[in-house]
Amino acid sequence: MADTQTLLQNFGQVYDNPVLLDRSVTAPVTEGLNVLLASFQALYLQYQKHHFVVEGAEFYSLHEFFNSSYNEVQDHVHEIGERLNGLGGVPAASFSKLAELTCFEQESDGVYSSRKMVENDLAAEQAIINVIRRQAAQAESLGDRGTRYLYEKILLKTEERAYHLAHFLAKDSLTLGFVQPAQN
């Protein structure tokens, strides 16, 4: 017996939705949701890799931070995917589509210093913050208050991770004394 696949809805195609938002609203909103979904998927993989490979004096605190961050980011992906589907859209899922839609420069494969990993994560979070702010304003202007509210909840968590990453990069650190000569 031959295996057949029947495509029910193309990516980018938006169907009617049970929350009664017009397609003129949901089409641009679902497009923005997919940019964030892709970006959080890429960030999830980056945080997960950092969790696996981090070493050095800050190992334990960074190891735990990367773990909690990739779990939070995974939750964002879930919420965004559910919202996309609820609005009649199709969540991006192929690696090629996710890479195309991601809003930040993805870190190349390899292992980097702890500082560089944190810098890359902060740059990614900041790029995502900018997209969330734009998309929240767009959703509000189109009358999609539910998506705007979802964006605002995610924005607060994303900003909090950015604060923590910036704190890891602070110049005042016990470990700097181990690797830099004392200045008298």
Swiss-Prot record:
Keywords: DNA-binding, Heme, Iron, Metal-binding. The keyword Cytoplasm does not apply. It holds the Pfam family Ferritin. InterPro entries: DPS_DNA-bd, DPS_DNA-bd_CS, Ferritin-like, Ferritin-like_SF, Ferritin_DPS_dom. Gene3D superfamilies: 1.20.1260.10. GO terms for molecular function: DNA binding; ferric iron binding; oxidoreductase activity, acting on metal ions. Involved in protection of chromosomal DNA from damage under nutrient-limited and oxidative stress conditions. Binds heme. Hexamer. Belongs to the Dps family. This is Nutrient stress-induced DNA-binding protein. It comes from Nostoc sp. (strain PCC 7120 / SAG 25.82 / UTEX 2576).
